[in-house]
From Swiss-Prot:
GO MF annotation: an example: proton-transporting ATP synthase activity, rotational mechanism
Keywords: ATP synthesis, CF(0), Chloroplast, Hydrogen ion transport, Ion transport, Lipid-binding, Membrane, Plastid, Thylakoid, Transmembrane, Transmembrane helix, Transport
Highest taxon, organism lineage: Eukaryota
Subcellular location(s) per record: Plastid, Chloroplast thylakoid membrane
Segments crossing the lipid bilayer: 3-23, 53-73
Keyword Coiled coil carried by entry: no
SUPFAM superfamilies listed in its UniProt record: F1F0 ATP synthase subunit C
GO cellular component, one term: chloroplast thylakoid membrane
Pfam families: ATP-synt_C (PF00137)
Protein name: ATP synthase subunit c, chloroplastic
Length: 81
């Protein structure tokens, strides 16, 4: 395998994980902060807010997992060879 293609694949894998984690990380922090604020304002709605928060966090985390899958596919199942 060409070393240049191999090096570019490793760099692309790192960028895929890094860039795929930025958006969900910011979104999860914002969602958690808003959930805490909502629970502080309406403590009786804690269960509903927590359930909605956990579901939305799972959807956001899926984006990071997609980035990880792409990052693992680049070095091991290299489509550029």
């Amino acid at each position: 395998m060409n070393p240049l293609i191999s090096a570019a694949s490793v760099i692309a894998a790192g960028l895929a994980v890094g860039l795929a984690s930025i958006g969900p990380g910011v979104g999860q922090g914002t969602a958690a902060g808003q959930a805490v604020e909502g629970i502080a304002r309406q403590p009786e709605a804690e269960g509903k807010i927590r359930g909605t928060l956990l579901l939305s966090l799972a959807f956001m985390e899926a984006l990071t997992i997609y980035g990880l899958v792409v990052a693992l596919a680049l070095p091991f199942a290299n489509p550029f060879v």
